[in-house]
Amino acid sequence: PYSCAPYGADAYPNSLGPSAPFAAAGYIFAIQDVRGAFMSDGEFVDMRPHKPVKAGPADIDESTDTFDTIAWLTANLPGNNGRVGMYGVSYPGFYAATGMIDAHPALRAVSPQAPIADWFFDDFHHHGAFFLPHTFNFFASFGLARDGRKTAWNPGFRHGTPDGYQFFLDIGPLANLETQHLKGQVAFWREAAAHPNYDDFWQARDLLPHLKQVAPAVLTVGGGS
């Protein structure tokens, strides 16, 4: 199984892969930082829009990055049998799903688990209302700009109070979170605030229209909350 994720190689350190039987059966595991995250070069783009038509070899998206990774692994990793599986949970589930678009022939099975697919509705807006605490708390740490390669997570945001409700009540207008706390350090926060409606910005980040003629076997895992 091959996991391609934005959370770093140590995001799930308590186990190797989704279950011990995979390791016992002799599977080879590869964990990769996605483009622009942690130790990978390039520019990280949140929910990078898929490009169904490429202008040339330099025109990339997460699907092409996954294709190239699988091509390299199957050509260079000793002992591999030329068959690859992918899985991911939450944001990593998005990367698992993108990998099965125009998939490499070696990709045989994919399991996106609680994956992001249409981010506007999946996480950031519930019944039309902006899900403020979730969005701010996540991006105030995860969304901080990277200054070169690194292995450590960004520090968590310190609210100055254990009462989260009171923190957001006291902050006043949404713009105050930018001017008082984020101060230009989180690009995606500014983009989300600038696009309160389901416009072209969000529609371009909807993965669902691109999940057509998927070749690998797929097991999607989800739940309710």
Regions inferred by a protein language model and the residue ranges of each:
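Glycine-rich nucleophile elbow surrounding the catalytic serine of serine-hydrolase chemistry
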Residues: G88-T98
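Gly/Ser-rich "nucleophile elbow"/oxyanion-hole loop immediately N-terminal to the catalytic nucleophile
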Residues: E43-D61, D68-G85, S90
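Short beta-strand immediately N-terminal to the catalytic nucleophile in serine-hydrolase-like folds
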Residues: M86-G88, Q113, V221
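Short beta-strand/loop motif that positions the catalytic acidic residue
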Residues: V214, T220-G222
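Accessory cap/linker subdomain of secreted extracellular hydrolases
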Residues: S3-P18, A24, D46-P52, G56-D59, ...
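Acidic catalytic loop of the alpha/beta-hydrolase fold
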Residues: S225
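Serine-hydrolase catalytic-loop signature spanning alpha/beta hydrolases and amidase-signature enzymes
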Residues: P6-A9, F29, W72
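Conserved alpha/beta-hydrolase
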Residues: S19-M39
